[in-house]
Amino acid sequence: GHSFPTRRSSDLVLYEEIDSNLNLSFKYRKSKNQVEKNKICKQAAEYLEEGQCIALDASSTALLFAKYLIKFNRLTIVTNGLYTAMALKDHPNLKVILIGGLVSCKSGSIEGILGKEIIPKINIDTAFVSAHGFTLEEGLTDFNIYECEIKKLLVERASSIVGLLDYSKLEKHSTTSFADANKINTIITDDKTPDRKSVV
C-alpha cells in the first residue's frame, strides 16, 4: 500500500470546520477551534527552514500559521490568501508574493487563474495546504473549483507537500482534486484516525 509520513498530536481536531454548510464566512471559520488549529500550525512550523520559499493556501489555518513565520529572518511566502498576505506585509524579513485574481468576498481568497503566469517562475520548497477531503484514490480534494485551480498550480511547483488534515477529512472526498496522494510528502493529523493502516 501507499506509505508516507504522518504526524499526529493528541487533541487536534478541525483546522477548518465546514460540516453541512460549505459557505460559512471566513470570520466564523477563523473563530472556531483556535486551540486545535494552533496545535496543527505549531507542528507544521517544524518543517520550516531559513531561506525557504513556501506556499500557503487561503485557509483560516494558513492565517494562524502566519504568526509562526515572523520569527524567521528570511522566508518567501507565496499565497492566494489576502488576509494572510496582509498579516505578513509589515515584516521586512519576509517576502510576500500575493497571487492575483478575483477576490472572494466570503473567504478573502484569490480565485481563478488570472495570476497563473507568475507561479511557474517560482521555485517553491514546501506547500502547506488544507483540504475538505483526502482519499488514496483522489488525493486532496476541495469544493471550491476556482481556488483549487490555484492550489493545483502551487503544489505542482513545490518540492514538498504538507497536508493539514484532521481525522474527519480522511477517507472523504469533495468536488475537485488538486494533489494526488503519491505526491504528498507529509500529512499532519491527529490521533483520532479511525483506521490508521488505511492512511499510513
What are these regions (language model features)?
Residues 1-2, 199:
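Low-complexity/repetitive intrinsically disordered segments
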Residues 2-9:
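Short, small-residue-biased leader/transition segments that mark boundaries at the very start
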